[in-house]
Regions:
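Conserved ABC transporter NBD signature motif
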Residues: 58-69, 73-74
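Conserved ABC ATPase "signature" region
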Residues: 98, 102, 108-125
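Conserved ABC ATPase signature
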Residues: 129-136
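Conserved catalytic motifs of ABC-family nucleotide-binding domains
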Residues: 150
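Catalytic Walker B motif of ABC-type/P-loop ATPase nucleotide-binding domains
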Residues: 154-158
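ABC transporter nucleotide-binding domain
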Residues: 173-261
Length: 305
């Protein structure tokens, strides 16, 4: 079942189009990555879904209800976390969370919040003023707020920004557990492609306000046919470079190392040619494509067009 349906969504600011006729859906218990370069597309889309700005054209249905006509009912079952959230700075951590617990009409919100601040390692900071928190501590506070009402739909904009690796891992595991146990649906943005690959079921790429690719992280990675072969030569570096030039390989070299950009299926052919020429390498590493390579390729191609 689709929890979120977006059809032909467009948002213009004067002559500038921030979101350009995009359509997608998010299913129950699914994590959908919304990715793209820095720019207004992702944030504007999230702002529209939160009712913070109105679309120029397009339709949004959440929980099978038209969003505009059912905003209050829908928003009580949603929540979000983002680095640009502004909380009352002069309130203490627990005061901020209690405010949101009451706002969302959460039963037993005090007990719920105590569990959350322990989960996100904020318990010892509960009496600190919000404006005294570090960036990483604020991120954890935003996440506590996001989960306080057990939302059916969660919008997470860079949820692990400013977090140490161990806390980032804790956050990802918590999100995955929520999805598994409560069928929470998550729209997830991040610039950490390894994180996206780990956590997202599907990914949408936005560039200049348009959807330019949509697939699973693995499916998108498979679209990149090239890999990088790193070869180290103690001897005969010059002869190896000459062979690669003669066969018109795309490569670069520095000191004893040669880096070859090559189609993955042709790696065996390359190694065979080196062997026939009796050019022995002391070490080899093969860097297979990742989602980050796909991200860079998409942006490069679109910027050239």
């Amino acid at each position: 079942m689709a929890v979120l349906e977006v059809k032909n969504l467009t948002k213009k600011f004067g002559k500038f189009t921030a979101v350009d006729n995009i359509s997608f859906e998010l299913k129950e218990g699914e994590i959908l990555g919304l990715l793209g370069p820095n720019g207004p597309g992702k944030t504007t889309t999230i702002d529209i879904l939160l009712g913070l700005t109105k679309p120029t054209t397009g339709e949004i249905k959440i929980f099978d209800l038209p969003f505009e006509e059912n905003r209050e009912k829908i928003l009580k079952q949603m929540n979000f976390s983002a680095a640009y959230v502004n909380l009352p700075w002069r309130l203490k951590v627990w005061e901020n969370l209690y405010t949101f617990g009451r706002l969302y009409e959460v039963e037993d919100y005090k007990e719920k919040i105590e569990i959350l601040i322990k989960e996100f390692q904020l318990f010892d900071l509960r009496n600190k003023l919000t404006d005294s928190l570090s960036s990483g501590q604020l991120t954890r506070l935003y996440l506590c707020k996001a989960f306080v009402n057990n939302p059916r739909l969660l919008l997470l904009d860079e949820p692990t920004a400013f977090l140490d690796p161990d806390i980032s891992d804790l956050v990802r595991k918590y999100i995955l557990n929520k999805v598994k146990t409560e069928k929470t649906s998550v729209l997830f943005t991040s610039h950490n492609m390894a994180e996206v690959t780990e956590i997202c079921d599907r990914v949408i790429f936005l560039n200049k306000g348009k959807i330019v690719a949509e697939d699973t992280p693995v499916g998108l990675t498979k679209r990149i046919k090239f890999c990088k072969v790193r070869l180290f030569f103690d001897l005969n570096l010059g002869k190896a470079e000459l062979l690669l030039k003669n066969y018109k390989y795309n490569f670069s070299s520095v000191e004893k190392e040669i880096l070859v950009d090559i189609e993955e299926e042709k790696v065996g052919q390359l190694l065979g040619r080196l062997s026939l020429a009796k050019l022995k390498y002391s070490q080899i590493t093969i860097e297979k494509p990742t989602l980050e390579h796909f991200f860079l390729e998409v942006i490069r191609n679109k910027n050239e067009n």
